[in-house]
Each structure stands twice: as C-alpha cells, then as structure tokens.
From Swiss-Prot:
Function of the protein: ATP-dependent specificity component of the Clp protease. It directs the protease to specific substrates. Can perform chaperone functions in the absence of ClpP.
InterPro entries: AAA+_ATPase (IPR003593), ATP-dep_Clp_protease_ClpX (IPR050052), ATPase_AAA_core (IPR003959), Clp_ATPase_C (IPR019489), Clp_protease_ATP-bd_su_ClpX (IPR004487), ClpX_bact (IPR046425), P-loop_NTPase (IPR027417), Sigma_54_int_dom_ATP-bd_2 (IPR025943)
Lineage: Bacteria, Pseudomonadati, Campylobacterota, Epsilonproteobacteria, Campylobacterales
Source organism of the structure: Helicobacter hepaticus (strain ATCC 51449 / 3B1)
Protein name per UniProt: ATP-dependent Clp protease ATP-binding subunit ClpX
Gene label: clpX
Transmembrane domains' residue ranges: none
GO MF entries: ATP binding; ATP hydrolysis activity; ATP-dependent protein folding chaperone; protein dimerization activity; unfolded protein binding; zinc ion binding
Entry GO CC: HslUV protease complex
ClpX-type ZB domain: residues covered: 1-52
Binding-site positions, Zn(2+): 8, 11, 33, 36
Amino acid sequence: MNEIKKRCSFCNKEESLDNPIINSGITPDVYICNYCLIVGSEILTGYLNKNPQQDQEAIDIKTPSPKELKAKLDEYVIGQDEAKRVFSVAVYNHYKRIKANSLSEEEMPNPILQDDVELSKSNILLIGPTGSGKTLMAQTLARFLDIPIAISDATSLTEAGYVGEDVENILTRLLQAADGDVKKAEKGIVFIDEIDKISRLSENRSITRDVSGEGVQQALLKIIEGSVVNIPPKGGRKHPNQEFVQINTSDILFVCGGAFDGLGDIIKRRLGGNVLGFHGEKKGKSEEDALLKYVEPDDLISYGLIPELIGRLHMITTLSPISKEAMVEILTKPKNALIKQYQKIFEIDGATLHFEKDAIESIAELAIARKTGARGLRSIMEGAMIDLMYDLPELAGYEITISKECIMDKQSPLRVKKKRNIQKRA
C-alpha cells in the first residue's frame, strides 16, 4: 500500500527531500512546508521591525491647494488650462484622502468626520494627442510633491502567460523609483500611457498575446482598484522559488493616458451631429479633436475599454492638440524650455547661443508636420544642432546665431567672435 504524501496546507505542494513538511502540532490535518515557513518568518520579521514613526513620515505628504498645484504645472506645461485644473483637483483630493484616512478619530478636525466614512480614491484618464503634455503633467507634480512615479507603456504589457511584460512589473518600477521604500511606493503615482492601444477592438492584433486586449485590462483592473500584490523586487517573470515584496495599491494614484484615435467618430454618432459647429461639416482631424470634450464613459466602452476599468477612472479630462503658437511658447517659456537648455549648454563652454524668431517657428512647424507634438521638439533640435555641438569645445568666446535656414536647410550658423570689453585706465 502506497503511503499518501503530505501536502502543505498553504501552497498545496507535496513533501519532497528539498522541501520537508511538518505538522502544525495543533490540528492533525494541517501542514506547512519549509518554503512557506521561511516566507512566513520573513513576513513576521518585517512586521516586528516596523517603525511606526517611519510609517507616519511616509503618510505625511505635503498637500498644496489645487491653485498651487496648477501654478506649478503652469511653470512647465504650456496651455491645456482645463486639463491642468482637473488634474490638480484630482491630485489634491487623492492625497487629502490619504491623509484623512490615516487620522485617528481624536485627530479629526471636525466631529462630522468622525463617522467611520472612508474616502475612496479617484484615478485619472487623460485623453489627448501624442506630445500634448499628459506625461509631463504627471512628472511635474510627482517631482513637486516629492513622491515616486513609474511610467509604463500599455502596449508592452501582457496577460500572465504571454511573452512580454507582466502588469505587476509597473509596481516593481515604482518600488525602484522609491529606492526600495515600500511605504513611499504605496503613496506614489503610476502613469500608464497608450491605454487606448489595449482596447478590445484594437487593430494591433498578434497571435503571441491576448488578441482582444481584455486580458491586459483585467490584469490592470486588479492593481488599479486597490489590492495587495506580490511583486518580484527586481522585476521579471514570477517563479515559485523567488522572494516577493507585498505592495498595497489602495493609495497609489493611477493616471492613464491615450490619444484614442477615432473616438471622435463614436462621440459624433452618439450626438447625432447635433453639436454646434459640426453639423454638415466635412470631417477633419481638428473636428475630431474638438469633439473629445464631449466624451462620456459609454463612448470609451464603445471604443473597447471594459466597463470595470472605466468605472475605476473617475476623473476624465481631455487635452488639445498643440498649436504653432503654443509650440513656440513651449520652446521658450517654461523653466526647462529646450531653448534655455541649449543656451545653458553653450554657456558652460563659454559660448553664447541665439535663436532667431523664424528659426524657433520653423522648429515648431516641423514638429506639427511630423505629428509628434512637443515630444518631437528635442529630436528636431538635436538634428539641427549636432554639427555645432561637435565643434562646441572650440567655440569659447563666440556668439552663434541659429537662423531659419539652419533648421530647414541645414545651413551652418553664423559664428562671430565676441569683442573683449577692455576698460582703459584713468
């Protein structure tokens, strides 16, 4: 008669030479294996070593007002006023909620709040063309609030079991951005770009991954709605013998972004062409972009996002395509404007860099023509400046002027040796 092998009551593994199983000593039919015993011991050690003061510090995130948050966005993001207002309110409410939920009953400033009401979080969906400022807004406020941020592309994510990146790896990136501090990561921001590319109706289909995109959406739903997730601290695929870190996603702010090409058609069909200014017009890209401000959750479901995911993205706002005038401002006005960055680089080597107005406008026109938005400005600048940058160490004491011809026709810029200002002695 074969002896029945014992199984671990926690992981259901059979007893083996390298994984012995012991009885609990209390209940006859309850067993625990060596692996689960080690994991349990590590978890208990973590709880015993917790420093309550550190936990409180992790929760104590500064919460500037929505006006202060928008003012910070105004320093780096040109235009998009409505989107910046909505985003600022959403971020303010999110971190105010975390602070309120962490207060004890005695710490509540108002007796009305002492009623066991727990505030739920509102994640954000930003709809707008490539290079319109979606990622920059999230990065700017994360830096301002001194919280970690992880940025992922939804097109690289796959359902468990397919070739590609596990959805949980987003949280691994966030943990790494928090320098391994779990508590800090649990109050961070996750930005998922190109969320529209994993719609159930996506044309980008492949036999090597979930063809509908719904599996990836379901996997995202689990972490977005708030749950405790086991992640490998160094990323990669999960396997039974590796160590995991537990992250609670309940207080992580998820921001999703996408261009949603074709969404305007869905909105127009729903409205029946009864929107002022669109009835009887010839369809164009500008018309579709203008229609996006009328977007409703049902339109996004028709586009191919699952209702459960839309139900977790409570704050929806749209960003407009960037005009030529706005593109020129992006190049020159923000604190970290590209023109200012290049001028700083030249200053370090003792040279002075000037851009003629026509040159800046030409850069903006090229970015619009390439349909890359503000994101494409740097590559245009790099292409136009590469030869000059190569010679830069020998240009100390020169004034260099970039003209329209330098940008459009690759002509060499004007280089003039600066005159030394020698004062005569009296």
